[in-house]
């Protein structure tokens, strides 16, 4: 009976689920093109990382970058499906999947650095911590009642900036250029949040998702420089 009640709770749309995301057809198309561009670039970027990881790194690098790329593509895919679906009975499930995938993308973005650059307990502890937070976030997003977008945006931002806790191992093991790219990407994501929580902004979703694609692109470059090509840049870190 509890399972049936939970299923009904998860699948029942609320008033916000039945509101169209876009005020005009132009806004809808703009957001679609942003998603198409993001998904295309993420897919190509994932292949590039896989090839270069196989050339310059070992199996660990290949696996870590594959996790990162898959999480990024998963987030963009769920976002595309959810945002472009008209109000319908499936909307609440798609929304939950879209928002849950953000936690996976953030954890996936940490993974190449925590597993391939960090050492000792920092590598183990921080990797376990970010994935524990991610899985907890996914579980909550999939079953919990709706909470305001502003609240969850704050949670995502805090999770993304959790890296400051590991500032010392990052400074010790990550190339300065990659560090700069990580910070820049974080700032882009954070700036985009202010657009997302401002419903009066025209083309809000397209602009917000544009920030997401831009931030993801910068972080892709950070993974390339700081993890995949790190063996060729090792002297610069020392």
Model-derived features: positions:
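Multi-pass alpha-helical transmembrane bundles in non-GPCR membrane proteins
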Residues: 2-238
């Amino acid at each position: 009976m509890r399972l049936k009640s939970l299923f009904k709770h998860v699948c029942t749309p609320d008033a916000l689920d039945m509101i169209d995301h876009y005020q005009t057809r132009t806004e809808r198309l703009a957001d679609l093109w942003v998603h198409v561009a993001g998904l295309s670039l993420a897919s190509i970027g994932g292949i590039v990382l896989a090839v270069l990881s196989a050339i310059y790194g070992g199996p660990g690098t290949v696996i870590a970058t594959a996790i990162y790329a898959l999480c990024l593509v998963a987030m963009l895919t769920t976002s595309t499906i959810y945002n472009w679906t008209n109000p319908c009975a499936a909307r609440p499930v798609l929304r939950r999947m879209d928002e849950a995938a953000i936690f996976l993308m953030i954890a996936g973005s940490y993974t190449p650095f925590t597993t391939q650059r960090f050492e000792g307990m920092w590598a183990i502890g921080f990797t376990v911590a970010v994935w524990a937070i991610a899985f907890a976030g996914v579980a909550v997003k999939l079953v919990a009642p709706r909470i305001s977008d502003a609240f969850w945006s704050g949670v995502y931002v805090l999770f993304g900036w959790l890296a400051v806790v590991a500032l010392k191992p990052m400074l010790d093991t990550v190339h300065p250029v990659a560090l700069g790219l990580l910070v820049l990407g974080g700032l882009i994501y954070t700036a985009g949040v202010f657009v997302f929580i401002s419903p009066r902004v025209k083309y809000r979703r397209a602009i917000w998702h544009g920030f997401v694609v831009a931030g993801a692109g910068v972080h892709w470059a950070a993974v390339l420089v700081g993890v995949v090509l790190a063996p060729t840049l090792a002297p610069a870190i020392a």
